[in-house]
């Protein structure tokens, strides 16, 4: 396949955007050195801005080279349902009624575990939230887990190593934890219909292996940082008044409705507007809605949709050159530099793939979903919520990569050997 000029430009901008994600701290330093233009440098230093910014550059170049008709046609044919859904579910999952319910569930589980200090709560969050993602979707699970981990652990006196290890395990566990069903994990969703993978297939081929890996990863990081967790007393109870049960039920029903109609933006956005009205009517039972963070994440994902739509010309041949044994490792590595749903989507376009190839492609894609912020669609949501708790308000990409590597290896072994 001979690439067009725009495809070559899009590939170049895509790799520039990837490099930009590794250089956000450079822009933060520029903001301190050059206060006159600190605003623009701070903007470019936001990880969530990166892909949206370079997608805008691509669209401007498309207007200049191809004309307005072709440029607008390309944008109109992109599917922005996922960014809209992630925005909606982030805001709705981060509310006081939902968080109080999740906190109560974690506290009840921690009591059953009988572990010292904060170990029980920590272990419960890293196991329950990712597995719950198979039913409430991964973005909702990521938002809940990140909010709980931020409030109860990362905002307190803990080491940077602990913070990176927590983020790495969270990203990997959420990526693999959504594979118990065929609708919650974006890379699975892309292939479930064309490959006829139902919930029974997912549970028997992926789900139990993923659940085992999630538990091993969570237990491993808990044991590794047991001294910090044992010395960390349980987080103090929230000073907020308990939310009335009818309001909790209304919030849960609206969130469930959004999840059920996740592929119908006209419906779930209508539910979101109703949720905003409800939050405004009962503002005394609401905390600040995370609208800014959710909008940044949606901008990031929308940019990924625009840039990613022109990468098929080089990505698909790379995948098809591999056999079923090689594609697992290839998909795991490629996922770190692309979106894992994009990888599996490209695989779904190819006919005649063996069952072994299909399994290896999806298993590799979800295994590598925690290595970088762009590897899995929910990762930017977790990053936006937890990043302020890290030193200088920034997460080092290499630090995240190294922190996620052990959990990634555990997940890979589970999918390959079990």
Protein language model features and the residues they cover:
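Interfacial loop-to-helix junctions that mark the boundaries of transmembrane helices
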Residues: 1-8, 40-48, 69-83, 199-209, ...
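Juxtamembrane and boundary regions of transmembrane helices in multi-pass small-molecule transporters
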Residues: 2, 6-31, 164, 168, ...
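Hydrophobic mid-bilayer segments of alpha-helices in multi-pass membrane transport proteins
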Residues: 8-26, 46-64, 79-92, 144, ...
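Flexible interhelical linker loops that connect adjacent transmembrane helices
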Residues: 38, 224-248, 283-292
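Transmembrane alpha-helix boundary signature
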Residues: 59-75, 89-108, 131-143, 309-317
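Transmembrane helical segments that form the transport core of multi-pass membrane transport proteins
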Residues: 65-68, 72-73, 99, 250-355
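Helix-loop-helix module between adjacent transmembrane segments
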Residues: 90-96, 116-117, 128-140, 172-181, ...
């Amino acid at each position: 396949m001979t690439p067009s000029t725009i495809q070559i430009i899009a590939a170049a901008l895509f790799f520039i955007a990837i490099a930009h994600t590794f250089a956000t701290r450079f822009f933060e330093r520029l903001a301190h050195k050059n206060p006159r233009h600190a605003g623009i440098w701070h903007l470019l230093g936001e990880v969530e801005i990166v892909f949206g910014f370079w997608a805008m550059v691509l669209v401007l170049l498309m207007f200049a080279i191809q004309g307005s008709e072709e440029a607008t046609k390309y944008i109109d044919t992109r599917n922005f349902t996922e960014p809209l859904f992630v925005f909606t579910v982030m805001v709705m999952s981060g509310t006081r009624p939902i968080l109080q319910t999740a906190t109560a569930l974690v506290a009840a589980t921690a009591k059953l575990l009988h572990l010292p200090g904060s170990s029980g709560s920590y272990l419960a969050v890293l196991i329950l939230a990712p597995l719950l993602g198979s039913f409430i979707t991964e973005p909702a699970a990521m938002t809940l887990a990140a909010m709980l981990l931020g409030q109860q652990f990362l905002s307190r006196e803990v080491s940077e190593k602990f913070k990176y290890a927590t983020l790495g395990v969270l990203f990997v566990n959420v990526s693999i934890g959504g594979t118990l069903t065929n609708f919650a994990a974006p890379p699975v969703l892309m292939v479930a219909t064309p490959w006829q993978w139902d919930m029974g297939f997912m549970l028997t081929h992926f789900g139990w292996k993923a659940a085992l890996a999630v538990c091993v990863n969570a237990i491993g990081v808990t044991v590794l940082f047991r001294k910090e967790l044992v010395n960390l007393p349980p987080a103090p109870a929230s000073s907020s008044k308990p939310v009335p049960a009818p309001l909790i039920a209304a919030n849960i029903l609206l969130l469930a409705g959004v999840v059920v109609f996740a592929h119908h933006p006209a419906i779930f956005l209508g539910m979101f507007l109703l949720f905003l009205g409800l939050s405004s009517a009962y503002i005394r039972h609401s905390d600040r809605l995370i609208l800014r963070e959710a909008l940044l994440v949606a901008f990031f994902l929308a940019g990924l949709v625009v840039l990613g739509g022109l990468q098929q010309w080089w990505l698909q041949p790379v995948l098809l050159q591999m056999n079923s044994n090689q594609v697992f490792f290839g998909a795991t590595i490629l996922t770190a530099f692309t979106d894992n749903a994009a990888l599996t989507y490209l695989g779904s376009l190819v006919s005649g793939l063996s069952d072994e190839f299909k399994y290896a492609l999806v298993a590799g894609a979800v295994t590598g979903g925690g290595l970088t912020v762009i590897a899995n669609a929910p990762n930017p949501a977790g990053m936006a919520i937890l990043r302020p708790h890290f030193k200088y308000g920034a997460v080092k990409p290499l630090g995240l990569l190294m922190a996620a590597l052990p959990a990634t290896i555990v997940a890979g072994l589970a999918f390959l050997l079990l």
